[in-house]
From Swiss-Prot:
Protein name: Solute carrier family 15 member 3
GO molecular function: dipeptide transmembrane transporter activity; peptidoglycan transmembrane transporter activity; symporter activity
PANTHER family the UniProt entry points to: OLIGOPEPTIDE TRANSPORTER-RELATED (PTHR11654)
Disulfide bonds: none
Species lineage: Eukaryota, Metazoa, Chordata, Craniata, Vertebrata
Length: 578
């Protein structure tokens, strides 16, 4: 039986409590219901997101568009980068103008519209409406000379597709930056332990959506039809939007409190220019009497300064995580390249009783290398419930539960071990290549010369990067939310995700830098492969970068913990977080 309705309960700062009556067990029950709705929305949104990214290169490279592989890869990287770098936009809109509930609702609506536009590009009529007729493929002139340069032309339907992908990235980034803090708002009144558990299960739902997308949506797109696959994506986003609106009565919604980003920038400028510091401080004190400061809307100058001091302490912690993100995103780039040059077994064993045609087809049907991401996802799906129900309660009873910063340091260690394992495996692989011990294997229409090492040797590095997520990314989310000033929680969550995107771009930039002549990734004699590269040194370089920043992180984290234990700092932080 559903709970009877009650009048809307206003609270401080215009906060709206759930439209449900509260019995003796009401608060905890409805808070869990609200959190469960947020987790379900997150799972559906992530399933839709991975459904787009997993086969986007294949879709753009299909006969519908005939994009080159380089053009399709560039579009995918742009989409992934934008989906992280645009995260502060959604957080800022939520803090200043719309509030988190309305920002999420509008973002899901934009998500639905953009995915619908992507769906229309599959049909011939839809492509003609948005892009016109596809031009005939021109015959390239003979170009025997190395100095001959072909003419560059924009790929078919590029403007429409880039616009659709940009809208999808904006919607996904806004949902990512605001849904996290909105879900934490639902359980904040239940204590810090409830917030910690929420972030554990929030990350669990992300990976559950990923595994469902990789197993179902990506398979349908590749083996049945993109029309069916993208229709499922639209349905997932529509269902997420419906569930979010349906759960409105049980949500705690908070009005926009205003973002202090501009105030923070002004204070940063004043602190960098001592000549302006005293004059601005004198002008503020001269124009504001004590009784006027209490009636002034928004944060007072003193609160602005306290927020700025908290922000100055938080940002170094988040910035030192950037090298970890450089390592983390290798599992979607260089780890995949490495796997393509290891021996990949067939899905079906060749049966001597079947026809020659079927035998040929089955022998080329290999396990998708991207499915090794399932090892990363599986370890998260298994370990998060174990950690939440067994390990953390035991450590809490023994008063040995580590802080968020200590967990993040442990996560950086596991990321370091993952990239070291990848480097050792690559070094071993290159020894087989140097001895000319290669195995030709056909993956799709591309021929690769792989080392006779099974691809299953990559599983340890995927498992280790999965464990690192549990200890680095989840506590990082918890740290960003719980330590941020209340009026900047959305923006800080956006900055957290933005910095992860910066790590991805820095990793790509390092690959590009090492691809110049003389670099470790420069392979002019082996176009499309990495057998003449020295990617093991690239892995070890990343490990060295993360090791150095891990030491810096430990120093910054220790200093942060000592400052946080200071009584004056505790009083200031409690006032800031409200």
């Amino acid at each position: 039986m559903s709970a009877p309705r009650a009048e809307e309960q206003p609270s401080r700062s215009g906060e709206r409590q759930p439209l449900v009556a509260r019995g003796p067990r009401g608060p905890r029950r409805w808070r869990r219901t609200a959190a469960a709705a947020v987790l379900l929305v997150q799972m559906l949104e992530r399933a839709a997101f991975f459904g787009v990214t997993s086969n986007l290169v294949l879709y753009l490279n299909s006969l519908n568009f005939n994009w080159d592989g380089q053009q399709a890869s560039r579009a995918t990287l742009l989409f992934l980068g934008a989906s992280y770098l645009l995260a502060p936009v959604g957080g800022w809109l939520a803090d200043v103008y719309l509030g988190r509930f309305l920002t999420i609702s509008l973002s899901l609506l934009l998500y639905l519209a953009a995915s619908g536009l992507l769906l229309t590009t599959i049909t011939n009529d839809g492509r003609r409406s948005f892009c016109g007729e596809m031009p005939e493929l021109p015959l390239e002139p003979a170009c025997p000379s190395s100095s001959c340069q072909g003419s560059w032309s924009s790929p078919y339907c590029a403007t429409t597709l880039y616009l659709v992908l940009l809208l999808l990235a904006l919607a996904a980034s806004s949902v990512r930056s605001t849904l996290t803090s909105f879900g934490a708002d639902q359980v904040m009144d239940l204590g810090r332990d409830a917030t910690r558990r929420f972030f554990n299960w929030f990350y669990w739902s992300i990976n559950l959506g990923a595994i469902l997308s990789l197993l179902v949506v990506a398979f349908i797109e590749q083996n049945i039809s993109f029309l069916w696959g993208y229709s499922i994506i639209v349905g997932l986003v529509g269902l997420a939007f419906f569930i979010f609106l349906f759960a409105t009565p049980v949500f705690i919604t908070k009005p926009p409190t205003g973002s202090q980003v501009s105030s923070m920038l002004k204070l940063a400028f004043q602190n960098c220019c001592p000549c302006r510091r005293s004059s601005s401080r004198d002008s503020e004190s001269a124009h504001l009497l004590p009784d006027q400061r209490s009636n002034q809307p928004g944060p007072s100058p003193q609160e602005d300064m306290a927020n700025f001091q908290v922000l100055v302490k938080i940002l170094p912690v988040m910035v030192t995580l950037v090298p970890y993100w450089m390592v983390y995103f290798q599992m979607q780039s260089t780890y995949v390249l490495q796997g393509l040059h290891l021996h990949i077994p067939n899905i079906f064993r060749t049966n001597p009783n079947i026809s020659l045609l079927l035998r040929s087809d089955s022998s080329n049907y290999r396990i998708p290398e991207a499915w090794l991401l399932l090892a990363n996802v599986a370890v998260i799906l298994i370990l998060i419930p174990v950690k939440d129900h067994l390990i953390d309660p035991l450590l809490l009873r023994c008063k040995l539960l580590p802080s968020s910063l200590q967990k993040m340091a442990l996560g950086m260690f596991f990321g370091f071990t993952s990239i070291i394992v990848a480097g050792v495996l690559e070094k071993e692989r290159l020894q087989y290549i140097a001895a000319n011990q290669t195995v030709p294997q056909l993956i799709g229409k591309d021929l690769y010369y792989a080392a006779p090492l099974s691809i299953w040797w990559q599983i340890p590095q995927y498992l280790l990067i999965g464990v690192s997520e549990i200890f680095a990314s989840i506590p990082g989310l918890e740290f960003a939310y719980s330590e941020a000033p209340r009026s900047m929680q959305g923006a800080i969550m956006g900055i957290f995700f933005c910095l992860s995107g910066v790590g991805s771009l820095l990793g790509s930039g390092l690959v590009a830098l090492l691809s110049f002549p003389g670099g470790w990734m420069y392979c002019p004699k082996d176009f499309g492969n990495i057998n003449n590269c020295q990617m093991d040194r690239y892995f070890f370089l990343l490990a060295g970068i993360e090791a150095v920043t891990a030491v810096l992180f430990l120093w910054i984290a220790g200093r942060y913990e000592r400052t946080r234990q200071d009584p004056a700092s505790q009083r200031s932080s409690s006032r800031v977080r409200g």
